[in-house]
Curated annotation (Swiss-Prot):
Monomer. Its cofactor is Zn(2+). The keyword rRNA-binding does not apply. Its EC number is 3.1.1.96. The keyword Transcription regulation does not apply. It catalyses: a D-aminoacyl-tRNA + H2O = a tRNA + a D-alpha-amino acid + H(+); glycyl-tRNA(Ala) + H2O = tRNA(Ala) + glycine + H(+). Belongs to the DtdA deacylase family. It comes from Halobacterium salinarum (strain ATCC 700922 / JCM 11081 / NRC-1). Binds 2 Zn(2+) ions per subunit. This is D-aminoacyl-tRNA deacylase. It comes from the Archaea. GO terms for biological process: D-amino acid catabolic process. The lineage of its organism: Archaea, Methanobacteriati, Methanobacteriota, Stenosarchaea group, Halobacteria.
């Protein structure tokens, strides 16, 4: 059951409520109480930032409380969602240095819906944690229509918020993962990107100004810890260089990760992430997950990759070579920020490794005249320009040399030199048999400094 809070002191709140009644049939169950399938609405006179223990006002037990509200700012038309809490003194409701229970899974869903329903002129963003209330009685969030009186009375904007909130029926407040964010601007571009691009829900966010209000992280460890516990999170993104904050987070038993780590673990079970990082290397050191990682549930083989063949394939088509690895492997080790395969990989089974080698051979086929596999060996041959042969025929470096290298016949010293006269056979021959590598434990920062989620 979703509990929706409406405030008569907020014109945008009542306008969203009016739009919600247009798209959903509500039964009046009290003077200021209404119910529809999976939804209960309570209308309050006071401003919602000052309403404590709102969950107790509903007749039914609610799984979460959603406050529909205005957003004020110089941000133009904006639909947003955020959690509530104070990192310093409570100036606008709630308690000092306290955060309310968050609902990251539902928040991710509502931001996705806002993006789907937003009129063209509206932006969509997550805001950082701010203002009250901090005592709600259930996981909660504000979903807002902004940012000026014109938008507060805009039917299209209000209807978009109403539809997004209605879509929360049946959506649990929490999932199996969440990340909290420290640092950045009030409108949290990093968190908004993560919500748009990955399956990671975002919990509480402490913006730069919030951390200024917080003061020394080690002196307010309880607030830092509460961000995680209230979000059901064990991972954190830290914007910028904040050594004391990072140390405090790790001392509390949580794990600081990079945005790359969050993006690369999108859709991959965290137990699988931990196992593969332990068997191969860390994401920050080049581990990249393949398509099977999202659904594979069995064991896996750690295999040494055939470097000589990969070097040749990368020279033909780097992207296709990497795609071959990520299509068949649970995870691959890479260099150059994930743009080249190197080292080893984890495959679900021997058949997956063989399919990978077949795909790499197909990459070579694009530029090699012959590619064959026999007895665990791959052989690829092609005719290539031989600069030494051209020099031996007296062709100096320059435009004519370049045309000859490009496969064009040239006239030199009164004779025609055909490309075939300056070619040699290049052969790539390498062992591509499956060589399983003993698994070695890879130390991760979380081994001594944090815990997995």
């Amino acid at each position: 059951m979703i509990g929706i809070v409406v405030s008569r002191a907020d014109g945008a709140s009542t306008h969203i409520w009016a739009q919600l009644r247009e798209i959903e049939d509500f039964e009046r169950i009290g003077p200021d109480a209404y119910r529809a399938d999976g939804i209960e609405v309570r209308v309050f006179e006071e401003l919602h930032t000052t309403i404590d223990d709102a969950a107790d006002a509903f007749e039914a037990a609610v799984d979460m409380v959603v406050v529909v509200s205005r957003h004020s700012g110089d941000t133009g038309p904006l639909l947003s969602a955020h959690y509530t809490g104070n990192f310093g003194a409570a100036e606008y409701g709630g308690a000092d240095r306290s955060v309310a229970p968050a609902c990251p899974n539902a928040h991710h869903a509502v931001v996705d819906s806002l993006r789907s329903y937003a009129p063209p002129e509206y932006d969509v963003a997550m805001e950082c944690t701010h203002h009250g209330p901090t005592s709600v009685g259930a996981p909660s969030m504000f979903v807002e229509l902004g940012s000026s009186p014109a938008e507060w009375q805009d039917d299209a904007g209000a209807r978009a918020v109403a539809r997004a909130v209605r879509d929360l029926r049946g959506v649990p407040p929490h999932g199996d993962r969440a990340v909290v964010v420290f640092g950045g601007g009030h409108y949290t571009p990093r968190a908004t990107r993560i919500l748009a691009d990955t399956d990671w829900p975002v919990g509480h966010v402490a913006a730069d100004w919030s951390l200024t209000e917080l003061g020394r992280p080690n002196a307010h460890r309880g607030v830092v810890d509460a961000m995680f516990t209230a979000s059901g999170a064990a991972h954190a993104l830290v914007e910028g260089d904040r050594p004391e904050l990072t140390e405090t987070i790790r001392d509390l038993g949580y794990t600081v990760v990079s945005e790359t780590w969050v993006r690369e673990t999108d859709g991959v079970p965290l137990s699988r992430v931990a196992a593969l990082e332990e068997s191969l290397t860390t994401v920050d050191d080049g581990l990249r997950f393949g398509e099977p990682a999202a659904t594979h549930t069995g064991g896996y083989l750690v295999v040494e990759l055939p470097d000589a063949v990969l070097d040749a394939a990368h020279a033909v088509d780097t992207a296709a070579t990497v795609a071959a690895g990520r299509s068949h492997a649970l995870a691959v080790t890479t260099v150059n920020a994930g743009r080249r395969l190197a080292g080893s990989a984890a495959f679900p089974d021997a058949d997956a490794y063989e399919a990978f080698v077949d795909d790499v051979a197909a990459v070579l086929n694009a530029e090699y005249a012959s590619v064959s596999r026999a007895d665990g060996e791959l052989t690829a041959t092609r005719e290539v320009f031989d600069p030494e042969a051209a020099a031996a025929l007296g062709v100096p470096e320059g435009p004519a040399f370049g045309r000859l290298a490009g496969g064009e016949a040239i006239e030199h010293d009164g004779r025609t030199i055909a490309p075939a006269a300056v070619t040699s056979t290049e052969t790539v021959r390498a062992d591509v048999a499956l060589h399983e590598r003993p698994r070695e434990r890879v130390r991760r920062p979380s081994d001594d400094e944090g815990k997995g989620n």
